[in-house]
Amino acid sequence: MEEPTVQFSDEDLVDNFPPMDDERVQLEDLEFEVERPSEGLEDEGSHSSAKKESKGAEKMRKSTTKDQVQAFHLRKSLNLLDKMHEEKDVFIQKTKGELHICRQRMDLLNKQQESLAAEIATEKEANNMAAIGRLQAASRRLQTELENEKDLQSKITAMLKDSENAMWHIEIQKGQFEDVRKHHEAEAEARQRGLEVHSARQLQREREAMEKSEKNRLLRARKSLHTQKELGLRHQKLVEDAQRNHRIAVKFLKASLGRVREREQKEEMESRTHMQRRMDAVLSLKNNITASRETLKKFQAWGQTRADLAKQKALTEKEVILSQGGDAFKYLFHQRRHQELEAQKRAFEEEQKLRKQEIVNRILKEEAEEEQRKRRQHPLSKPINRRTLRDKTWQYISDFCEGKSVLTSQQERERELLLYPKTVCVIKAISSESVQVDLGSISTEDEVLAEPDISGLWNKESYQVPKEDMERKPVGGSKMEKDILARTMEQLRSGVVQKQVVSGREFKGRPFNSKPEVIHFKDFDIGKVYKKKITLINATYTINYCKLVGVEENLKDFIHIDFEPPGPMSAGMSCEVLVTFKPMINKDLEGNVSFLAQTGSFSVPLKCSTKKCSLSLDKELIDFGTYVVGETTSRIITLTNVGGLGTKFKFLPDSEFYEMDESQPAMKISSLFTCEEKIIYEKIMTSLSEQQLEVNDSSLVDLQSLKESEKQLDDPEVTTAAVSAMTMIPSEEQAEITLGEVTEGEIGPFSSVKVPITFTPVIPGEVQTKFKVMFKNPQSPPLYFRATGTAIDVPVWVPKATVDLKICMYDRLYQDSITVHTRSKAALRLKFEVCKELRGHIELLPETGYIQAQSTYSVQLKFLPRQSLPEDARKYFDPASRVLEAPMTIRVADQIKPVRFTVQAIVTTSDLEINPSEINFGYCTIYEAIRTEICLSNLSLLPQEFGFVGLPKYVDIQPNDGFGTILPLETLHLDVIFQPIKAKEYKFELVCKSEINRCFKVSCQAVGVHPPLELSHYQIKFSATSLYDTSVSTLYVINSHLSMNKMIHSLPRIGSEEAAPVGPTSFEFLLPPNSPITISPSVGTVLPGKRCLIQVAFQPVLPKEIIYKEASQILNKEIETKPVSQKEIVQRKELWKQSFSVVRVHNRDRPTRVSTPQATELQRPVINSSSTEFQIAQATLSKAFQGKFNRFVIPCVVASGDIKDRKTAEPLSFSPHNTLYLELWCPAVAPFIVVTSHKGKTDFNFGDIAVGHRSVKKITLQNICNEDLTLEYSVLNPNGPFVRLNPFNKLRSGETQTLVLSFSPHENILAQETLDIITKRGTLSLTLFGMGVASMITCSIDGNILNMGYVLARESVSTNFKLQNESSLPIKFWVRLESLSRKKAEAHQQLPKFITSHEQRAEIVGTQNYNGQSVFSIVPVEGLMFPGKAQEFTVTFSPDHESLFFSDLLKVVLFEKKVSHQILLKGAAREHMMFVEGGDPLDVPVESLAVVTAFDTEHKEEAEELKPILVTLNYVQLDTDTTTSPATRELQVGCIRTTQPSPRRPDHPLMVSTLLQLRGDVKETYKVTFVAHVVTGL
């Protein structure tokens, strides 16, 4: 806040002021002022001599310079004073503000002190000592703050006073320099006026120079124009010659091309026909293959489904049986056995069928051979009792099925030759297909052949009783034996109730004792026969009898008793009974063998038990005792099987679950199919194979593979596993008591297996583990045992069993400390060992040491991984994961188990890889930058910081200027941007340093190019442009190369090559094909020091391919939805008839497939850019357009020279290195306003409209953007034919409005205009065009007057004329007569014409008929004239009385408004055929309204009066000396052609007589005869 006050003197202000920045400007002004007196001396021109003038000027220049220097220093002093005055003023204002704030704070503190004093008084009254202390402390703090504020106020006040004093001193000094200031201001104004005068003179000189240059330019332009005209004439001549030669060449070329096209079309048609046939064949083959594969897939899926269903059914049955408590394994075994037997039976039947077919085929073949052989022999007599082929076949089949010997074909032929010599059998040939079909339908069981009435009549051999039947006894014995048995049984029955009393004692109990007491067949096998003898001992007191009763019902199928009754048996005597057991099922059987004795019945128990497992362990507890941690011991446990059935076993811990695999017997997959299904399947497969053989050999592979799969499925060795073994769940912790190597296997009957149990203590303490033995046999329950042991700990241990060094880099040292503990009460010697492979990388220090009792010992671990670590420690190092696990050993004296720990580390490299290692930027201009991408890869597992250092100023690396952190195994993509500053060759290196100061280099090279031309802009960003709208931007191509002096500016060159010459330089922009960019001009020449304006236009459009695709879809929909017209149906019928007739002609010889695509599909119209579908598709796609952004880089090649100087075919030598690039950003968006009417078209054709008429079109516009738009319209030509009828200025979002436009041509012209609808989001251009057609009609009447001539009254005459339509529009016309117009009624209101008639007629409509009808009529009165056609009109003249003044006006009106032609119709009527005209008129030219009465035809000539003709001849002779011409008048005598019959003969001329009365001096009467011949009708 302190501002020191400094006093300045005048000398200090003048001398010690630092120099200002405007010294240069002041010196320039000084030079101007020095030159000004010399100019004034020149203007005065009144000096005596040049010497005096120069001396005075030199003296004045010296004095002026001194004054200017002094004034300059004074000006600097004044500026310094002004600056100091401003600073002091600001500082004073700031100090005053701080003083005001300080006073406000003091007032606030005073108020707070007063409030605190009041609160202290209040608390004192309340005797609140705590509050009083707190308030007093606050009061003291406020007092301190108030004192500080007072000190601050005094300081600020002193500072303010000093500042004001300094301010006053500065103002006093400024007052002293006030006169100097005013003087300098006056000088500045004078200097400014001088500058303005100088500027005006300079401007005048520049204008004169400009006018002179403009004249020179006009002169050069005239000369250039003259030269261009000469060149144009010469060029036109050359073009005409070239065109003439071209026409001659084209004539011959067309002829040659025509022949070539005909030949190519012929070849193309042949190739198309051939290709069509091949395509049809391929499609047919493909369809057949697809159908076959689908069928095979269905059958495979069918078989798989049935197999799954069968498996599911088996599992369900197993669960049901288990839930019911039954034996599921036995049930499934029997079921599978049954299925196996059924499958074998079906397989045997199928084999029999195949054998039958094979035999039949063989017999047929032999018969065919025999028939051929016998045909070559002479015919023999009729065979006697010859067996047919059918008999022999079935005889052979029956013999084969019964197992008899079958004769071979050769033996059969020999036998036939012996039995039937010289016999021939004519056998009808049977195809193999019919034989197969018959055999497929024959069943050996269902076929019933014809049999004779007497059995054995047809048999050739007598029946022989088989040996088995002879040896077989009848069931139940012979008749005699049955009688004996009946008597014996009767005796036995009668003696059952007999009591045996001997010596007074009655026998009670079992009469016979059996040895053994129980008949037990153990461990039997199905199919084998077991026999046992039992001895029956008479246990009664006297003689007894024994008779076999039998066995129980459930044992009769398996037990056979051989017992011959011994007769009476004394007491103690015995007899033997042979019991035979033949098991058929694997099932336990129990029952009794019953006997009958004289004293009663008794029985011997019978048991049949299957093979079973009887398993046991020799011990249930294994006690290992006490062992030290690390030692290993083992015990043996024995598993014994005393049963007759072996099984598989597995020892496992009690905590684990394991289910033994149950092997299922072989089951054929084919058993899943029934016989009927298999027959159907075989038939389908046979048909498929036949089709495939006809189509292609490739399908044989599929069928072969299918058959192989069937064989594999039918193979009995293929079995399905019922239950898969579950995997054992490993224990998370390592078990101390484990099983040995033998944990599972198979134990046979009556054998034993020994299994070792191992105890390896790891943790001190008591260990107990339970085990169980699982068996595959479900009837054998698991066995359990347990093992116990006690472990004691070692005295030395390491707390950290694993030393984790984390991630380490090669060639860097890492250290850690390892602590060893002991619980021993004595000192122990320790030795630290590192494995041999890692001794060059890991070191433990010290290697040997002593650890004291119950203490710790530290060892230092040093790890320095070398690059050879992966090769040295292959056993401990994983190259894939880069993990090192090195075991370390601590050997302790008197301790068996060494202490081990592991050193674990992830070893990684510190390399950074840069790809590519060499960069060649190529040629690069100084106006552009080349960007290339490099990949920086971190091969380490640790993140590393990197940075590119020491970069040249023309190289940049992005992002982040080439600095950053790269993550482990990450690859960063960096952009190296090279922009040369001048043209030369560049070679440099990019250095990348890591955080550990490792350097990685990339070598770079490039060539800098300075092009002769440059662009004003190298990048253009267009605004968002709607589809079919245009955005335009401008730039300049500048030629700044003016001199070859390299000291002035850098010369354009390529690298170190020679500089480009000074002169006109040409350029050309190379646009990519099909781009929406237009550059105008794209080619040009720029003179040195000049620039050329370039316009770049961007007009986004939709690709035509997409539009054509959308248009074709629209056309297809229209064709599908369009109903078929009757014409198309008739056309299709005709085409079908034609194609059918062609097929019928070809089918006379063989069937031929004829393709007639015209009959099935009509030819579709061709879509072009002017079609309706194309425009609809374009509008639809424009609405759905989502926007697109394109970036174009347009190259601009540069060449030295002028384009005009080059020859016609010689291109300029453009260098590829002197290429400029223009970057364009082109965003395209959907249009914001679209046309919804006229199918979205923006081109509106009003068509051909007649001149003077108007056509109106309504255009519907819709705003499809999300905001309201204000519309502006471009100005249409005010004198043009197009007019906007209802312009609207606003279109809301989604709103639709209608714009009405009209087209009214004023002349015959093709009109086209563009109406731009302008919004802030874009412009919609509507193209309007129409043709104004003038109604050009020509009339065949010359002069527009049609004179009908003379007609006899009450007759009519007609004549024709034509109107020709010369325009391109059909014209509607109306023909109107003036006498029939509406204006006639107005004419009736006026005075009659004969009253106001003049000497000459002035009316168009003359005399009319008396009967009210028009005297003139015309046909037709209206119609339509087509373009180029003529319309013929017939005009009829029908007068009803005599008059010479018939007239009317005929008007041809076009389009009800325009009068095209006016034809005056005239005619005259006479009562007689002959008439005379001429002379002076004797009546008025208009007839009276009175009607002259008509006379009869007979008396007409008598009643008529002769009408005189007044001919006045005026002869005036003014001078008698001269002869004058006589007075003449002309009279016309006419004859009218009539259709009335004439009474005179035609060979006599018609005589006309008249009387001439001459009035004057001579009165004579002459008779004059006029002869008139009718030459033409008038």
Swiss-Prot record:
Biological process according to GO: axoneme assembly
Residue ranges with Basic and acidic residues bias: 33-65
Secretion signal span: none
UniProt biased composition (Acidic residues): 1-14
Chain positions covered by the region annotation Disordered: 1-21, 33-67
Principal place of residence: cytoplasm
GO cellular component annotations of the record: axoneme; sperm flagellum
Disulphide bridges, residue numbers: none
UniProt key word Coiled coil: yes
Keywords, sorted A to Z: Cell projection, Cilium, Coiled coil, Cytoplasm, Cytoskeleton, Flagellum
Record has Glycosyltransferase as a keyword: no
Listed CDD domains: UDM1_RNF168_RNF169-like (cd22249)
Compartments, as annotated in UniProt: Cytoplasm, Cytoskeleton, Cilium axoneme; Cytoplasm, Cytoskeleton, Flagellum axoneme
Coiled coil regions in record: 103-156, 330-378
UniProt cross-references to PANTHER family, sorted A to Z: CILIA- AND FLAGELLA-ASSOCIATED PROTEIN 74
Function, as annotated: As part of the central apparatus of the cilium axoneme may play a role in cilium movement. May play an important role in sperm architecture and function.
Family label: Belongs to the CFAP74 family.
Protein known as: Cilia- and flagella-associated protein 74
